[in-house]
Each structure stands twice: as C-alpha cells, then as structure tokens.
Amino acid sequence: MTSKVFITGGSGLLALNWAIAIRDSHNVTLGLHKQAVKIQGVNTQKIDLDSVEHLIRVFDESGTNIVLHAAGYTNIEACEVSPAMAWYINVNLANNVAKACAKLGLPLIHISTDHLYAGHEPMLDEFCVLKPVNVYGKTKAEAEGLVLESHPDSLVIRTNFFGWGSSYRQSFSDMIIGSLRSGKELKLFTDVYYTPILAETLASAVHDLVKLKASGVFNLVGGERISKYNFGIDIARVFGLDAGLIKPSLLSDNVGLVERPLDMSLSNQKACQLLGRELGNVTDGLIRLYQQEKIGQAREIGIL
C-alpha cells in the first residue's frame, strides 16, 4: 500500500524537491498557504497551520500516513527584525503540527537546522549542547524541544540542504550557477563551513529512517565539511563553469549582518550507522544536481 505523505510549507524549496524525489513511490500532498504550485503527480491542498483542530481534520480526511513539517521562517535577517513572527511560525506552528500528529498517531518528520550552535567547533553530533547565536537558531532550538514534548516519537532532522529553487525563491546553488553562467563575479565566504546534502538524498535517507521506526534527533547532512567558497568552486567544476569568477570573502568582515555561526558542520554518523550506509560527499550531490537539470527537474521546479 502506497504511503500518503503530507508536506507543510509546500511551496518551499525543500518541499518541492522532496515531493519530486518521492512522488513515484508515495502519494504526496503539498500543504499550501498562499503560493500556488502545480507539479505533475503531486496533489496540493490549502492548509491552516494556526489550528490544531483543522490540521487533525485535514490529516484524517486525507488519509495521511506521514507528515513532513517543512514550513518555516528561514530568513535570518528577517527573523532578527521580527522575532515575534519568527517565534510564532517556527515554534508555535511547529508545535501545532506535532500536537495534531500525536492526536492521530501519525509519524512526524520535523525539519530543523544546523544553526543551533555558537560555531566554534566542527562536526558536532546530536548530543552537543545547543548554543544558538541568533533569533532564527533560538526559535528552531525551542521548536525541537516542544515538538518532542508534544509528540515524543517525532523524527527531528537537523540539516542543511541544496537543490533546485523556484522562480520566486532561488536556492544558494541556483545563485552560484546563475551568476557563473552570466559571467558575473561573486564573493563567497571562506570562513563559513557546513555539511550540505542534496535534498533528494535527504528525502531518501529520512524515509528510510521512518521505515526503521526511528525517532528523536538525527543529523541528516552530507559527509563532507566544506566552506561556502569551496562549495562554489566545486559547483563550477561539476557544471563546467569559470571558477575564476568566484572571489574569496570573509563573513567576519561583514559587520552589518546578523551574527551567524562560522562552523555549522555536523556529524552524520548516528544516522549512517542506523542506515548502514554513508550519505555521500559534496561532489556526489553536485553530480546528481547536474543530472537533475539534464532530465528536466530544474526546469520543472524553476517554472513555478
């Protein structure tokens, strides 16, 4: 029997890439707020995350088997300017989804972040003490705790992903590829490190964890710690573009930005040990990203 997966934040980058990744093996519904989307083989439905009762009714009537909570307020600068809004969206609404799933006994995949630490140490595991440095990180850390309190069997995923973006929301890799193809120079940070994973790879790994009935917190990231600058260099290499257009820059020199952790890299070994496989390096993910463009996936998402 095909599982029915309901994805909140259905117009977002992660939701769109996730839906395409699993649509051949799952019945997928994208939960939408304002932005309308249309993807072949994927259902859509308007949803109100403000109401637990509404969520219970929607999940129940649609026959949902798994809920992926991918909605969120992710603009770090905007979160700092509007902390109440960030708190409401990232914490309260996430808790509403958790309560609804708990009431119905549904598996919940809650998408968290890697912006949870001070950024002074590399490759942190799930047991390290959280020390977020900005409003966005603080709201995501709080959400993790409330979600697990409301629905202890939830699967909380700390991650940092890349994939193809839409016409209304470019991804980081879109920005790099677009700039290089236009012959424009761009500056990327050499002092910011992370462990990015392709959204498609993330989706596959998470659903395998669901099959294993895993719960609790997991770092679902790539296996390679890399700077934003070197990520751009690797994109240029894989896509056959001019890496000379990428210039090194330092986040530490950009004093006007909201504070961010310099090192967001996470260890994925807990997940890898349970899955019985590694999750690949940056080049693996970028080669697949390139293949996705060739088979039309970038265009399918990009025209939305």
Predicted region positions:
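NAD(P)-dependent short-chain dehydrogenase/reductase
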Residues: 145-194, 201
